[in-house]
A protein has these predicted regions:
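Conserved serine DD-peptidase/penicillin-binding transpeptidase domain
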Residues: 2-272
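C-terminal soluble interaction/assembly domains
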Residues: 258-261, 268-292
Length: 293
């Protein structure tokens, strides 16, 4: 089992130009990363595409709009200094987070701050990081206000060192679109418009421009277990419900009913005590005993 991410257009490109929007269609890949976006960009270039006259339009389907389901995730919509509280989405890069690399070249007084594999960050950066030993601790935070998202940095880092940190996005589909647009530009594909999202932009008959498959489901589960990754767990929970029902669940709690049914079919869990409202357990209302697991 794998999950597919596609780029589609309303019609076939002509003379290297996509007329209209470039649509990003996710398939619930919980491990989508920046290298995958580079792969999509490389496919466009291999097809001779050098320009998109419209926007990067990111579809929120097949999950739709998911609201925050825990205090941690609701708080993270405005600011986050962690990655664990990213909101699950049908399409979200780096587990729904910004990957930020802080490098301190020898001889420099200020550190370089940018993306990990995306080149420059496609959102504003505020503050600076000093290069010196024994200074205040490095602080990296994602802040969202009426102007949008930005990364705020402060503190210091030792000369010759580097730090990679992840900070939860407030809106993973938008963040994915911004990263893709930036990567396309670096790959030689000019996008005239900005980044927007929609529930569903076009049908299955839309022109397929590029396509990538995720790592196998088994490896996604392995990463979830190794890193105790909330984002993977809850995206996979949404995928389980989508597969079982053939339609998008209304919420993460609604999708988690499929996990409850699975535990009960296995003969575990007291009917009166078992509560599963997320696959990750980030929802504090979950009630499972060690015997249930």
């Amino acid at each position: 089992q794998t999950f597919v991410t596609e780029l589609r257009a309303a019609r076939a490109p002509v003379d290297g130009i996509v007329e209209g929007d470039l649509v990003v269609r996710g398939g619930g890949d919980s491990t989508l990363d920046e290298t995958t976006l580079w792969g999509l960009a490389a496919q466009l270039r291999s097809h001779g595409i050098t320009r998109v006259r419209g926007r990067v339009l990111v579809e929120r389907a097949p999950f739709g709009d998911l609201t925050c389901d825990t205090v941690d995730r609701c708080t993270s919509l405005l600011r986050s200094s962690r990655a664990y509280n990213a909101v699950p989405s049908a399409i979200g890069v780096n587990y729904g987070s910004w990957c930020v690399m802080v490098r301190a070249p020898q001889g420099a007084t200020r550190a370089q701050v940018g993306g990990c594999a995306s080149g420059p960050l496609p959102i504003p950066l505020s503050g600076s990081v000093q290069v010196r030993a024994g200074g205040p601790a490095l602080a990296v935070e994602r802040v969202t206000d009426e102007a949008g998202e930005r990364i705020a940095v402060s503190g210091s880092i030792a000369p010759g060192s580097e730090r990679m940190v992840h900070r939860a996005m407030s809106d993973p589909p938008v963040g994915t679109g911004l990263l893709l647009r930036s990567i396309l530009g670096q790959a030689g594909v000019t996008v005239d418009g900005g980044v927007e999202t929609t529930l569903r932009a076009m049908g299955q008959d839309a022109w397929l421009v590029a396509r990538v498959e995720s790592i196998p489901l088994q490896e996604q589960v392995g990463r979830m277990m190794r890193w105790s990754n909330n984002y993977i767990a809850d995206v996979l929970t949404m995928n389980v419900a989508l597969k079982a029902r053939g339609a998008a669940p209304a919420s993460l709690a609604d999708a988690s009913a499929e996990l409850t049914a699975l535990v009960r079919r296995a003969g575990a869990g007291d009917a009166g005590d078992l509560v599963i409202e997320s696959g990750s357990g980030l929802t504090t209302t979950n009630r499972l005993s060690a015997q249930d697991l």
